[in-house]
Design a protein with these regions (language model features):
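A composition-driven surface/loop motif
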Residues: 50-59, 64
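Active-site and NAD+-binding cores of ADP-ribose-processing enzymes
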Residues: 12-52, 82-184
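Short acidic, low-complexity intrinsically disordered linear motifs used
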Residues: 1-9
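Charged/polar, solvent-exposed surface patches and flexible loops
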Residues: 6, 75, 79-80, 140-143
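Short active-site loop/helix that positions an aromatic residue
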Residues: 70-87
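Short His-Asn-centered micro-motif
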Residues: 65-68, 151
Length: 184
C-alpha cells in the first residue's frame, strides 16, 4: 500500500533547475515576455479551478508553473510540447529558477499515487462535473506542501487530463530563486 509520505519528494530529488516559459493557449495566445519584477513571492493564494471559474478541470489556480530545465537542450518537456503541438503558444524565452533546499513537494507518477493524495485532500465537485467526486482540493493541499509535481504524462492519470507533460505547480515561491532568462 502506498503511503502519502512515500510521495513526498525532497528538493534534492527534483531537477535543481526549473524553467518557467510564458505563453499558453486561449484567446490571448501570443509571445509573452517575462518580467522578473512580476515574479510572485511568498506562499501563493491557491484554489481549485472548478471552484474558481466553474470549469471542470482538476488543476490549481493561483500557482506558478515550471518544468524541469534541460540545459543541454535549452528547454523542458513543457517547452518541447508547446513547440511541437501548439506553436502559437511557444515563447522564445524562459525564466530559469534554482530550486532551494527543503522544498516539500508531492510527486505523482501514477493513478494510484493520485488516488492516495486525493483521499487526503478531496474536493466534491460532483454537482458540476463528471467524476467530480474525484477532484483535488488544491487550496488545502497548498497549505501543507510547497509544490506538486507531475512526473510525466497524464495518460495513465485520467483525473489530471489537462496536465500534458512533466511540470510542477508551485505554491511557495520561497523555494525557487530566479537566476536569469534563456532562449528556448
Amino acid at each position: 500500500m502506498i503511503k502519502l509520505k512515500d510521495l513526498i519528494t525532497e528538493a534534492a530529488q527534483l531537477s535543481k533547475l526549473q524553467i518557467f516559459s510564458p505563453g499558453t493557449g486561449g484567446k490571448q495566445s501570443l509571445n509573452w515576455k517575462f518580467n522578473p519584477e512580476k515574479i510572485p513571492t511568498g506562499r501563493l493564494n491557491v484554489s481549485s479551478m472548478v471552484q474558481y471559474g466553474g470549469m471542470c478541470h482538476n488543476k490549481p489556480v493561483g500557482i506558478f508553473w515550471t518544468s524541469s530545465y534541460k540545459q543541454k537542450f535549452k528547454g523542458s518537456a513543457w517547452t518541447d510540447f508547446k513547440k511541437k503541438r501548439f506553436p502559437k503558444w511557444h515563447s522564445s524565452m524562459g525564466a530559469v529558477f534554482e530550486l532551494q533546499s527543503g522544498a516539500k513537494i508531492l510527486k505523482i507518477r501514477s493513478h494510484s499515487d493520485y488516488m492516495k493524495i486525493q483521499e487526503k485532500f478531496p474536493l466534491d465537485a460532483s454537482k458540476k462535473c463528471p467524476s467530480g467526486h474525484m477532484y483535488m482540493d488544491w487550496g488545502k493541499l497548498s497549505k501543507k506542501y510547497d509544490g506538486f509535481q507531475l512526473a510525466g504524462s497524464t495518460m495513465s492519470i485520467p483525473m489530471l487530463g489537462q496536465w500534458d507533460v512533466e511540470s510542477t505547480a508551485w505554491f511557495n515561491m520561497r523555494k525557487l530563486k530566479f537566476v536569469g532568462t534563456t532562449k528556448v
